[in-house]
């Protein structure tokens, strides 16, 4: 029984590591966003609803992927939450009237299209996805 448990834990840890290694994301913004780079703390503040602007004063509106490895990698890397905790914190903000839930879109192409056509929009997509018409922000 112990051996089976150890094998299960090892495989679970390996699969989580594999997902994190495969899911590399880039942060994109509408061309109206002044900054060419963004800090991890700015991203966390924007995507948790704590702030609606970057340090340079650019007003931004976050847009999300509905789910998947890239979504999970972004939340883990830049927000420090899993999807369940992330959505719960947003529901709390929405319920208390402090914020509106960010748009969640199906797929990288939809996120790129939305960000390209909406001033101040900021989102994330898979690193290998086409991203013409949007600005790629360097995360520092």
Task: Cite the ranges covered by each PLM segment.
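Positively charged n-region of N-terminal signal peptides that target proteins for export
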Residues: 1-4
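Alpha-helical transmembrane segments of integral membrane proteins
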Residues: 6-7, 60
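Bacterial N-terminal signal peptides
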Residues: 7-16
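Sec/Tat signal peptide C-region and signal peptidase I cleavage site
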Residues: 16-23
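Exported/periplasmic ABC-transporter solute-binding proteins
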Residues: 24-140
